[in-house]
Structures are given as structure tokens and as C-alpha cells.
Amino acid sequence: MIPQWKIYPRSQGHSTVYLQNVVDDPSISVGDYTIYDDFVHDPRDFQRNNVLYHYPINHERLVIGKFCSIACGAKFLFNSANHTQRSLSTYIFPVLFEEWGLDVERVPEAWDNKGDIIVGNDVWIGYEAVVLAGVAIGDGAIIGSRAVVTKDVPPYTIVGGVPAKAIRKRFSDSEVARLLELKWWDWPEEKIAKSIDAIQSGDLEKLKRAANQA
């Protein structure tokens, strides 16, 4: 568990933050050791600059798992960014309810509610990528720079482009299944620290052996 007072993982640089210690919106949940790096803006302003169209009226959540790496300028766009396609017009009449004599309760009619954004564990989201409402990203996935993610991403899959499409899987199906079974990100911190060599080696057998050690 990271101490609540610890914001910067590197003593020599303040462009990277532990995200869970700079977010205070109860509808945003971030797992241990997930980092955000921003060399343009203050990374402590992630909640304001990177989580957009996120309003209490929609009761929507952003859930990010453990050990994720989020690059500079990555954005999470929520439901209010999507003008409804059910209407005969794209104009936001319900949002401008006072101008048009509508009830305030009709505001949500202006957009299509696609749900929460869920990001798994050990996910890397590249520079200026955009993740849209209703998307779930699986554990170990990689989102390419400036990709626009409109659909769910399976675990350990690399996606890129506009809209984002699968480029390739990082590992074989059997290896992915084993990694999802091991869930190293849920291990005690001491065990993870002892297993870093195994994780960094890319050797799944080595990680399996580490999993069996006390």
C-alpha cells in the first residue's frame, strides 16, 4: 500500500505521480502503484484535465486497476460528450433547458448513456490516447498512442488507430490464461519485489516458480 502522502514515485522528477493519491472524486477508483506521467501540465491535475464530461448527474465511474501506466495527455471521455443519436437533431436542447422552457430533469436526454469506463490491471495507455464511455480494457492490454478506444479490449491485446483495432496479442492464449490465473499484481508487495526479475525477464516459467515461493 502506498502511503497517502506519497505523490511522486521518483525523487528526482515531478512529472510522474501515483494516481490514487491525487484523485479525490469518489466516482474515480485507482489501484495501487498506477502512475500518470505528464510533461506538459501538472500531473496532479489529472482529474480535471484528463477525465472529461464526467458529471454527477450520470452516476458513472472510472475504475483503473493496479500497476497501470498512463501516458501524457491520455483522456477518458464520459457520456455527456456523446450527443444522442436517438433524437432527430444532434443539438443539446435538454442541456439548454432554461432557454427552451424544458424541465431540468430532461438534461440526460441530451446524450446516450453507455456506462462506466473500466481499466484492468497492468494496462499501458499511450500518449494522447482516448478511451470512450462504456469501454472495458482487460488486464495487461496496451493502448497505442492517439488511439481512440470505442470498444472493449481483451486482456493482453495491443490496439491502435482510430477507431482502435486489435494489432496483435502479446502472448499465446495459454500464456494469457496463465497470467490471468497468477494475477501477480494482487500478490503482497514483498513477494512482488522478490519477483521483479521474473516479471522483467518475460519468462513465464520463472514467474510460475516465483508464485510458488513463500
Residue map of PLM features:
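Short clusters of hydrophobic/aromatic residues that line enzyme substrate/ligand-binding pockets
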Residues: V23, L88, L207
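N-terminal capping/interface segment
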Residues: M1-Q20
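Hydrophobic transmembrane alpha-helix bundles
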Residues: W5, S69-A71, V176
